[in-house]
């Protein structure tokens, strides 16, 4: 059972990579259905303006702290074991341990090119990884028949874990909305992890990730896409 603390009405789980992997594995073993939100500061900000989104995030089985400010706050509250639980690192670590457990993985999100690169990289890094399937949805609004077909494909693959890379908040809404239609123990909204692991986008240097400056690296890398996210966050602060 994970401890949680409240930050501006948003649940943050007291976790680290090892504890997060253990929680996911426990849910797979028990068959409990849960979704996991990877929570950076931007998600906290978005939750302040959107009550429905806040309820969706708070309904997750685990909200991992994906940002050093959240880790620092948790440690100030006395949770010494809390550490940044970064999406790409969580995905790599769970894929690594899955090789000996036989857990089945399904990947949903990204572009057709990115997801093929992702699967290729994962098979290269984790040769015994059991990949149940993958699908990149179209950028346009997906039609109801298409959605039904994709959900059927996912269920037919019998995955133990579904990695959802649609970006936040879209992936969090998607997991919540389809949680009762999918026979999958665990879904994880993994954000840009598909792009990073596939090698499509560069990750910030480790020192920037550890010092809480990854946002600056990403803003410089993708100013047109991310300026609004970080400007809104600064305005709230």
Region spans (language model):
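Conserved beta-alpha
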Residues: 71-153, 157
């Amino acid at each position: 059972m994970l401890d949680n603390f409240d930050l501006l009405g948003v649940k943050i789980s007291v976790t680290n990579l090892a504890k997060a992997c253990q929680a996911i594995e426990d849910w797979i073993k028990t068959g409990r259905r849960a979704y996991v939100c990877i929570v950076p500061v931007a998600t906290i900000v978005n939750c302040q303006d959107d009550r429905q989104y806040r309820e969706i995030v708070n309904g997750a089985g685990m909200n991992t702290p994906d940002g050093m400010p959240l880790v620092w706050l948790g440690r100030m509250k006395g949770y010494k074991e809390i550490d940044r639980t970064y999406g790409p690192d969580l995905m790599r670590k769970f894929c690594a341990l899955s090789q000996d457990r036989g857990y089945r993985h399904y990947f949903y999100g990204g572009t057709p090119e990115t997801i093929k690169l992702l699967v290729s990289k994962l098979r290269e890094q984790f040769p015994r990884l059991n990949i149940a399937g993958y699908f990149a949805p179209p950028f346009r609004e997906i039609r109801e028949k298409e959605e039904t077909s994709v959900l059927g494909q996912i269920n037919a693959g019998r995955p133990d874990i579904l990695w959802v890379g649609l970006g936040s908040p879209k992936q969090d809404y998607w997991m919540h909305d389809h949680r009762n239609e999918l026979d999958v123990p665990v879904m994880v909204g993994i954000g840009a992890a598909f792009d990073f692991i596939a090698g499509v986008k560069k990750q910030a240097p480790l020192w920037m990730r550890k010092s809480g400056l990854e946002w600056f690296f990403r803003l410089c890398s993708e100013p047109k896409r991310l300026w609004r996210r970080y400007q809104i966050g600064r305005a709230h602060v």
